[in-house]
Amino acid sequence: MWNITDPQGWDYDGDLYFTGMPPIDEDFSPCKLETETLNKYVVIITYALVFLLSLLGNSLVMLVILYSRVGRSVTDIYLLNLALADLLFALTLPIWAASKVNGWIFGTFLCKVVSLLKEVNFYSGILLLACISVDRYLAIVHATRTLTQKRHLVKFVCVGCWGLSMILSLPFFLFRQAYHPNNSSPVCYEVLGNDTAKWRMVLRILPHTFGFIVPLLVMLFCYGFTLHTLFKAHMGQKHRAMRVVFAVVLIFLLCWLPYNLVLFTDTLMRTQLIKESCERRKDISKALEATEILGFFHSCLNPIIYAFIGQNFRHGFLKILAMHGLVSKEFLARHHVTSYTSSSVNVSSNL
């Protein structure tokens, strides 16, 4: 019979998603989850690519926004915080990559810190995007500018988003530690004693309810009414000005929604609402790893969106280059005229 009170009896095999939930069948034996060496190195190369792109891209985004003090909008302040969250997370990717090869060799402190940064990145991202959706909803649907133009209030909202993200992520910092199971590589894992399985389910369900589902519903509500208002009023220029915001939200959902859906399925399986088998466990573990990598990719995609869609971002970047003599002022002036004529009305002033 599976003994959940003795962690030494578990066979993790490096599976970071294992919850220790015992199966109902007493004759059931733990599944052996295998990881191919090729897959490990593909993951490492992917992490390295995301790290480099995120480090360069988000640093440029922060530089451009911080340089543009005069034309900085409320949305820009939110996107600045979004870039900071992605940058902090990117700094942990080399550690995650190394753990794919040798297991978790970095000790309990780094286990807590990098797990905290990963969760804070996710929660702050969706909370900030929810705040942007509310800001755009007030500005377009209700034509409210008093709240959206007070930047000092926006700073307090951002601080609140970071604080709530820290609270939602705090259990990972408190309970995760470096653990060395028998006959397996060390892992960074939540350890809560005999009730690890039960509490891990609680720690999984509550944060994702308040840190993902609720903000997602807020975004769907706000952007639904915002789009309805834009199309109803035939506000074509304002709609074009919202392209960056919509693209950022869409990319976030495409990157993180699959992981959360697989995680929800895994939760149903762990709580025996879906029958668990070795084959399903292997499929879920592979899906979790693949969709988590997709989520990691999100940290480097926003700067690419700004570069291709955000005219203000391109102009701000060229302005910095011109200040340092890397491009001519004539070229900057021509680019500014082109940008102005192609989008003469800028409702959100976002990047």
From Swiss-Prot:
Extracellular side: 1-41, 98-112, 176-204, 265-289
Topology versus the membrane: Multi-pass membrane protein
Subcellular location as annotated: Cell membrane
Annotated disulfide bonds: C111-C188
InterPro entries noted in UniProt: CCR1-9-like, Chemokine_CXCR1, Chemokine_CXCR_1/2, GPCR_Rhodpsn, GPCR_Rhodpsn_7TM
PROSITE patterns in the cross-refs: G_PROTEIN_RECEP_F1_1, G_PROTEIN_RECEP_F1_2
Superkingdom of the source species: Eukaryota
Keyword annotations of the record: Cell membrane, Chemotaxis, Disulfide bond, G-protein coupled receptor, Glycoprotein, Membrane, Receptor, Transducer, Transmembrane, Transmembrane helix
Assigned protein family: Belongs to the G-protein coupled receptor 1 family.
Function comment: Receptor to interleukin-8, which is a powerful neutrophils chemotactic factor. Binding of IL-8 to the receptor causes activation of neutrophils. This response is mediated via a G-protein that activates a phosphatidylinositol-calcium second messenger system.
Identification of the protein by name: C-X-C chemokine receptor type 1
Organism: Hoolock hoolock
Gene (UniProt): CXCR1
